[in-house]
């Protein structure tokens, strides 16, 4: 059926058209013919004649309903929204011409004006889908972002991350479901728990039959890209452009592979954080500007071994950072897992690889040699200028250390100070990168319709409990930073305290793009939290599961439940050699690309630990540092039953296979 103007119309609009006065039909025909070509023609418009917004909407409808139906639907939607507005305007002209008393004409005006205004307001709220800029670091702790107000960050501020927080929302209760790099990335891309996507441990490979959220965004009309650290043991899926590091990547002069050349890596001169940012901006400059974009910027930094950019190597050389309150923790009130880990600043932070003191090499010790080769793997990549900067800072510092002949707690304090100094110097470059990206958005008028997300793949220990690294379900590891800016949707300077998990990121991106969330995704969009008010039907607890034992750091397998106040953890599994014998050992990067079990055991990565099967319970309100395991204590029976029931429910509903 066609309208009087020659365009397609629904039956209801056609019948209404015939009832309108001739003068009204004449005005609509004249206006639509001169200003609205969609309404004044007998056939749908060519794609080239559509506005970018219309084209984006058609692309989305194509994905959902098919090409022919989509173009018809979008064209009719535009026509339907405009007809009431045009009618109001034309009827107003008709009334003015009518031979009626002035007071009657005036009494009719408010209704027409309100009708036209409401229609126009509704039209203005229909905005283009937002661009998505997702920035993720590797092992960035909340304690080193000054917006969170920790003692370390007060001495090493992050002004650009603070700027992002002022523009948007700071999330105080964001957590991961498995505090380990590759599993966390797999969770991001699939929106699934580790046991669901297949990437439970570092050495495993993700189930590539699982759909990545990037594939769904791409089909829905987004142009998609990822730059920096991928580390997923598979080809990037659903990306129009990628420029990614090989494996873990190097801080200096790293190798990248790019779109269409997966597996073919080329070295690029420079610092990884700067290069990754350069490639992100290059994508923004050359992208298809008729489409919204989703850009993932994944930094290697601040992953171990914390190599600062050459110009910032001595940035915090004279700063004395405070020791955490729990630095000298003896784990007396915890189970065996807290004592048998291998991630202590005093014993396990490597003097050569981590603290850059090659002068301490002991050629007769396997661990010392392994540490030396790991450091040289980075140093030998330096250009002459980079090597000069490295030697100028570290050689005098190391000389002072050796002359001081520190021992005991004084040596441990030296290790801590220099670990933190290198770590926050690496973060300084990350913060500058965030500033560059925010500046680009503002300079190119993209900031108003771009949601910017900053997070980390997990938290990290900055000396709490005497540790570095992550893995445990304890707060510093499970807890991860999250800052989101979305002008017009998130109030500036707002804070969210409700529980968020990284399984929520993929559903959020899909919701922002108007794409239906697949049923198998267990997370939920966090858009309702953007309003800044407490969402009553929000989740009350989270599930966590760490699988990667036995391997580096010897953190035992465990799962658990965290509520707003309590945390229940179950440590389980066979120890040491028995786990290896049952083929639970995953080959991991070592001194020769992939180490063997024997080589790793020689450098004390494995011990003949005992089998474990025990629980820990913490009241985070009265014991935020998790120093006192109250499992089994009198008065905790009710909360223990409640959490045990919830843990069993999670395992059953999620079909956890361990």
Model regions and ranges:
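Intrinsically disordered, low-complexity proline-rich regions
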Residues: 6-9, 22-39, 43-47, 55-60
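Low-complexity, intrinsically disordered or signal/transmembrane-proximal segments
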Residues: 8, 13-14, 35-38, 61-63, ...
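Tryptophan (W) side chains
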Residues: 17-20
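Ser/Thr-rich, low-complexity intrinsically disordered segments
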Residues: 50, 64-81
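Cysteine-centered motifs
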Residues: 87-89
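Formylglycine-dependent sulfatase
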Residues: 99, 104-107, 113, 119-616, ...
